[in-house]
Amino acid sequence: MTVENHLNKIMEKLLDHFPKQFVTVEQLIHSIDLTLLDEHATTEALAQLKQDAQQNQVAALCIYLQHLPEIMPQNSISTATVINFPQGMEPLDVSLTAIEKAALLGVTEIDYVLPYSLYLAGQTQKALQQCHAIAQLCKQHKLALKVILESGTFPSIQAIYTISRELIDLECDFIKTSTGKIAQGASISDAVAILSAIKDANASCGIKISGGIKKPQQAFHYAVLAELMIDKPINKNWFRIGASSLLGELLKTH
């Protein structure tokens, strides 16, 4: 058992002791990026997603680029799409072109996968240069940028802290844990590392928790942790949870 595993277990026990009113169900719902990343999603499923998002005023919708025409236009709900997803191995020009297309379709947020294989293979500068180019284009189009680490591939929480500090220096808007497409999704220790980087940098960067967040109790744990570490109430401007089924589970608790 690793140190991170021990940390996850003890932190979950500690977070369980916080009263439920510390973070409300409504706060959690308004922090959700309601996600449907199924290449074969039907028109009916996308219409239901849009309806659920608008009825419950989630933070954003997150879907594949090819499904945007069926969702747009949106009104009060932000719309995100994924780029360089899920393996983080697209050529940079392909990602840049996709962002240009998304901007034309009216997207307001980009969830971009860090070229983590490059980064972890020692080509850190090349990976960060690609992120810098993405960040500059997003800034040009006034798009919020969430960079997905795929935190389950990193060897330690110190490594997650280091990459988070580097991405904060590139002025990304959120650091996101996982694509949700590998076995290891988000963990409490990963979130501690990212939140520590945000706090130490005194940055306006936010955090997005994603990868296996299905139960209200999980969402509550991460929200409480974020509030304790950043010392302010959660809201969609700096705290998000990416999930497909969490909204339905939270609504059952009302």
Residue ranges and their predicted role:
Residues 27-36, 59-63, 78-84, 110-112, ...:
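Hydrophobic faces of well-ordered beta-strands that scaffold small-molecule active sites
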Residues 58-109:
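Active-site cofactor/substrate anionic-group-binding motifs, chiefly glycine-
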Residues 81, 85, 105-118, 169-187, ...:
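Glycine-rich phosphate-binding active-site loops on the catalytic face of alpha/beta enzymes
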Residues 90-104, 155-166, 189-192, 199, ...:
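Catalytic cores of alpha/beta
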